[in-house]
């Protein structure tokens, strides 16, 4: 028998009875105990126990029903709030510029000299754990510049850039493939790129997703896809340093490779905005402005805050053919060479970088 001011029939049915093989009775008043004991000692025992267990099962089912309903109500409420906080763009007022080509092209032999001015040395210093302006930072900068001087005519970078008609849904970007599409020959009609949405509103009250920045179906909007990596000769030189047991020199070259790829990403994105896609032909920005993303559009990279799922790399491989520039993917979607980057180009003027 269970009784007391802090007990209840529901608590007994849900929390106590399932833990005990025998019957567990809840009594509101101790005066009921003798009456219940008489029933259990007499010929009404089986009937009393059967009624008890039936009633407790009904209580458990009713609680489960209410719990499920409350959960559904919460989900619906969150979905309603999320939909209310989704960014809404008046697409009729937007100018959707067509890229200069559709499909995929390779940009070979991007020179180190071309991208060198775009290196963000702050990130280089962060990698080495030195502060800007310190003697340590100045010393490693001199060594890095000397290495760049030595390799600038020996190695290069390569890129793949594709442009595709696309449209946004509530949770993805859908890429359309034309007949003769270089990635599939038009056999595969669409590629769906999932774009996760923020679960909490930002400062402006929106829960952002990259799909918000791509026009709905039927408006002839486009996105770009890109990948950039160092040349095979760069990778071979780096591996040779590792085999020779030169940890400092190999780390210096690896860190420069990472910075060169990011610099090439900045340089190529500028070319895309001004000429290759051409949606911002009159852009005039300084390098420091580029670091602060003051340009129109964005280039979210796979595996980074707004596209965190590394397996999206396999979709990118389908779109632009990473092997064409000697990028290989691991089973988890990581790229080799390590000094590589891959992502999307989105041109909308309201697009911004954000974290999921």
Regions found by a protein language model. Give the residues of each.
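Short, ordered loop/turn segments at secondary-structure junctions
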Residues: 1-7, 28-31
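Glycine-rich, charge-decorated loop segments at or immediately adjacent to ligand/cofactor-binding or catalytic sites
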Residues: 5-20
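Structural recognition of alpha->loop->beta junctions
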Residues: 16-34
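Active-site loops and adjacent core secondary-structure elements that bind or stabilize anionic groups
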Residues: 31-251, 255, 276, 326-338, ...
